[in-house]
């Protein structure tokens, strides 16, 4: 499993309230910075699980990965609205676990699944 695969799996499980894999791969001193706002591991859990019924995370693609760093991009959809965005994350590792995650989000005008070989239902 790639680092990006593990990240996405942990976050998807956390969206459903299952933090076992999240706790396994995320460092106790974890910090997340999203759109310029920093939060710790416990607050991140609340944010992720609170968004679980609202957001579908689509496919992802790794831009760069080594032992201490991951940069990857993924699509997201707000389930009740026709809002789509692209998320780019810079993920730092310490002792083999995620220590810092910096994510920026950019709204995109059209559904990224249109004309592609995937659909949102595959990721719900």
Model-derived features: positions:
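C-terminal and inter-domain tail/linker signature
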Residues: 1-124
């Amino acid at each position: 499993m790639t680092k990006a695969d593990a990240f996405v799996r942990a976050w998807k499980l956390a969206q459903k309230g299952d933090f076992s894999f999240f706790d396994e791969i995320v460092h106790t001193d974890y910090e997340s910075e999203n759109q310029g706002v920093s939060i710790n591991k416990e607050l991140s859990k609340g944010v992720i699980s609170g968004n679980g019924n609202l957001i579908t995370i689509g496919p992802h693609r790794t831009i760069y990965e080594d032992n201490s760093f991951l940069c990857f991009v993924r699509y997201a959809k707000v389930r009740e609205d026709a809002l789509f965005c692209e998320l780019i994350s810079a993920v730092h590792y310490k002792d083999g676990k995620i220590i810092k995650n910096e994510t920026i989000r950019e709204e995109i005008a059209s559904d990224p699944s249109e004309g592609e070989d995937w659909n949102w239902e595959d990721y719900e």
